[in-house]
């Protein structure tokens, strides 16, 4: 089960009263998350307002040295109202996640780059990322991507067809 349940502090896309809530624990540097990303976008587009999508950070820092800073820069973007734009950009450019790349992306999105740089250097958003990691650990997450549908772990393969079928069964 998902612990804690989806709340106001989560990054959510879609109507709050959707019949289905899909939560992903993801890592911006994880190749499996990168492969799942376009499929997930396709499924969410297909199902439209029937599904609310929530993203929670789960950077696998032992395996992915840039994942923590990527998560923190996504939070810095969120602080300027551009979480989802940064989320998408990080997955689209997953092979380039050095700090200089992250700051370049912030500029491309029209963010205050100096502010992002200060926040990244000071780890201003590290506690927010850690909160997601702890909730993932409490929910039994050990790898990424990991999905939960209406609070229940989705353990089937994460390909678009399987995920879409599971979401449709939950409608």
Q: Where do the language-model regions lie?
A:
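A short beta-strand-turn-helix
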Residues: 3-20
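Extracellular/periplasmic catalytic domains that process cell-envelope and extracellular macromolecules
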Residues: 15, 46, 140-141
